């Protein structure tokens, strides 16, 4: 690019206002780029991107500016379906799975251990150019109407002139716009500017995602523009990267896997979203808020467990996956790996654009968390006493794991566990003098 078990899933980015360009608003419009979703299909230099668009303000005040590697032809631009991004989000979302212990009184110890091990292994039960443009050193290279969008491709001699042109076109540019635009002008990149065609948008309930297809040796996402109009704090970006080769990682920032595949207390089921937000923030803090977090890596032909059904071949083609043949991939692998990357970025911790590479690593990974419910029936058998002690030890371990994942205090966890909280260990001095 420019260069069975119950499954509960969450979408880590609750809104997806735009791609990592910036919104520019006319007059006093307050438009903020809070969170983004983007799907990237990449094979060699061939790149297709789908930029999520959940903008909900006045259509007259919408505009999107994105740096692109070259002047795009009209047939390189397409409007996608937001449902496809929703499908990717659901399919790759962090997930909570639950299992229930078997009756210890009806199983021999060897069979019991076999069943517990199998459960933990993860097998589930189921603008025209004018004088202003020329004076500012801006050239309108191309202009198109695509669906509900009017699109212009701009080139600029300097970032100040580009900012001036956009302002004189009636848009209120963020204060740091020229500074943010400058690196792309120096790289001789072009600027894709989309705004709403009110006539074509009549009756449109929601603006559709914009898709672009192009060749570029650079595999990257330009996030610096997205910081120019951030109101405060960091912004979230979810990247769904699809390649023929394997897992995608950042080459200029550390890429880490979110800690997971562990057992956590049962009460988390009531607020899995709140838990995951804390776990994600805690993981970032451990890496000084400078890491790109991997939340999912899997072959798109199957999943285990599945938070949602895998995307169909037709859906993948609509997202730009162009190398799949007509062969069916029912329950087996296909030449396509999905990587879900979550970035929380600001200018202090992410001063550069995101650079990526596709690796040959196809090892599956998912942000998976396990609830192991105890057996709650009659435990009057001889094995029942031993099993009860095992459950107490397991709950203590689950509470410790939760504290490590989230940074929550042991006391607050014990309070939320209620009667399931393991008893506090005796003071150390109890065993000294007998």
Per-region residue spans from a language model:
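A cross-kingdom signal targeting lumenal/periplasmic-facing segments of multi-pass membrane
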Residues: 78-146
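Surface-exposed, glycine/proline- and aromatic-rich loop segments on solvent-exposed faces
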Residues: 41-104, 162-183, 188
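Accessory, solvent-exposed terminal regions and/or long lumenal/extracellular loops of proteins
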Residues: 21-31, 173-401, 405, 409-415, ...
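Sec/Tat signal peptide C-region and signal peptidase I cleavage site
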Residues: 13-18
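Short, compositionally biased low-complexity segments enriched in polar/charged residues
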Residues: 27-42, 126-136
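Short hydrophobic-aromatic micro-motifs
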Residues: 48-50, 148-155
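A mature extracytoplasmic/lumenal domain signature
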Residues: 53-55, 68, 155-158, 198, ...
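Sec-dependent signal peptide recognition
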Residues: 1-7
